[in-house]
């Protein structure tokens, strides 16, 4: 799978268990608002084709470094999008930024692109990396709501979700996310271990 620069851990074991125990993802966003986790490549600037790194192998046909535009990129679109698997890129088919790319481009940079404004390249890559962490936690918190949480934990979960979904992020706030609010959420998620199977942490 692609590797993205600057991402945090987000308690990976708990993430996968919570997602496995909650097959139905609750819809928390208000009906009048677009779902922030919905990926819309038409509103992005091919950030995944720029920021992500991948290694030649089963999922990708060649190596690519972070910050290196993919050689298959044509404008803001992939020149082989309709035949990615056939061309040796099933990893691209499987990848989902969870709406982080389009949110960064539209919300943080007002529709600007690194392709027409090269000076924005690094800032957009960093914002994409951080927004991906924001959206990973939205996905995790939504899944947690389908578990048997006590009322206090349920309320805390909903408050975190509201902060992540409804806030209009700036580049500075995204840069501070992983050392601030993200840690608060991770600590909260870890506290949910009591609703997981008793043997989950065995041999870990």
What are these regions (language model features)?
Residues 29-47, 53-204:
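Short loop/turn segments that flank or connect secondary-structure elements
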Residues 4-6:
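Hydrophobic alpha-helical membrane-insertion segments
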């Amino acid at each position: 799978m692609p590797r993205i620069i600057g991402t945090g851990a987000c308690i990976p074991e708990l993430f996968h268990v919570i997602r496995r125990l909650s097959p139905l993802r609750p819809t928390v966003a208000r009906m009048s608002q677009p779902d922030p986790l919905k990926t819309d490549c038409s509103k992005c600037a091919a950030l995944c084709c720029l920021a992500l790194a991948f290694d030649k192998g089963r999922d990708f046909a060649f190596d690519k470094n972070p910050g290196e535009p993919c050689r298959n990129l044509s404008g803001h679109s992939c020149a082989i999008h309709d035949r990615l698997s056939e061309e040796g890129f099933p990893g691209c088919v499987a990848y989902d930024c969870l709406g982080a790319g389009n949110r960064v481009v539209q919300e943080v940079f007002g529709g600007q692109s690194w392709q027409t404004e090269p000076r924005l390249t690094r800032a957009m890559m960093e914002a994409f990396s951080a927004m991906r962490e924001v959206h990973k936690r939205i996905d995790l918190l939504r899944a947690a709501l389908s578990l048997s949480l006590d009322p206090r934990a349920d309320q805390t979960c909903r408050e975190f979700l509201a902060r992540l979904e409804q806030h209009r992020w700036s580049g500075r706030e995204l840069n501070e996310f992983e050392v601030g609010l993200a840690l608060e959420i991770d600590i909260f998620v870890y506290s949910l271990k009591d609703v997981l199977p008793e043997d989950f942490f065995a041999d870990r």
